[in-house]
Amino acid sequence: MDAIRIERLSKTFPNGRKGLEDIDLAIAPGEMVALIGASGSGKSTLLRQIASFSSSDARPSRIDIFGRSIQRDGRIARDVRRMRRDIGFVFQQFNLVNRLSVETNVLIGALARVPMWRRLAGRFSRADRALAAQALGEVGIAEHARERAANLSGGQQQRAALARALVQRARIILADEPIASLDPAASRRVMEMLRALNANHRLTVLVSLHQIDVALRFCPRVVALRAGRIVYDGPSAALTRERLHALYGDDAHLPFAVGDEVRPAAREAAGEPARRAPTAFDSAGSPDLPDSQPASPRRMLAASSMR
């Protein structure tokens, strides 16, 4: 059974622009897959369709999560909220509520699995709090549990979002450009944490990335989009310069500026040593820096209510 299965998915926006066209995609449980493509290629649209934040075109299509249909023929399943319990979504803009503590933000992940009276009262059990403490420790920010989320750096906020997915007991993590607003050191930590959660918890990870070198470094499989269509789906090691040029034009050489060997994830998957040339990550020694775009509490509260 696939963790995610998509068949013949298309999405047209109200202005008539095609966001996605005839997408077929299957991701096995425990895979870590990078979703790449130029701006406007459909990466974010595809992730939001998988979570069924909006409906697809009204034509024969389906999106299944662990064998259950979350969306079919342009209609979202009635029990979509229940099905979203299995999906942890990490947004580009940090999806925490700034005025709440880090611990409380992480505990929000438990809301979908607790009785209604506890949701309304905002009361969490001792077991919930123990799980939150364990999750915060796993992502390396346990010492910040009592602080307001607004005090965290950008990278720390993304790690808190991953801790919330653990408390949620999500089986899939959809990460929409989670490192786009981070400095290189913070980006590396977030990607290493995603890889650790994938390996240690067998979580299925689908992460959209603008940085091709990061995708090749951390993800054994790459899915590339162009103009809403899948133009490549396969091992990162087989993503050639020619294919990259078709996706990125004259900028396709940038990930290979310091050398060609930036594919350790693919080498490890094949049982080979993970040799690679240095990337921008390797010279980054600075601590996490606060992001210049703080989270919006209204947006994050809305996001948490959708789980």
UniProtKB/Swiss-Prot annotation:
Gene Ontology molecular function: any one: ABC-type phosphonate transporter activity
Matches recorded under Gene3D superfamilies: P-loop containing nucleotide triphosphate hydrolases (3.40.50.300)
Keyword ATP-binding: yes
UniProt key word Ribosomal protein: no
Enzyme class name: translocase
Domain of life the protein comes from: Bacteria
Compositionally biased region (Basic and acidic residues): 264-275
Chain sites annotated for binding ATP: G37, A38, S39, G40, S41, G42, K43, S44
Predominant place of localization: membrane
Domain ABC transporter: 4-252
Pfam families in UniProt: ABC_tran
GO cellular component terms given for this protein: plasma membrane
InterPro entries registered for this protein in UniProt: AAA+_ATPase, ABC_transporter-like_ATP-bd, ABC_transporter-like_CS, ABC_transpr_PhnC, MetN_ABC_transporter-like, P-loop_NTPase
PROSITE patterns according to UniProt: ABC_TRANSPORTER_1, ABC_TRANSPORTER_2, PHNC
Complex formation: The complex is composed of two ATP-binding proteins (PhnC), two transmembrane proteins (PhnE) and a solute-binding protein (PhnD).
Name of this chain's protein: Phosphonates import ATP-binding protein PhnC
Organism of provenance: Burkholderia mallei (strain ATCC 23344)
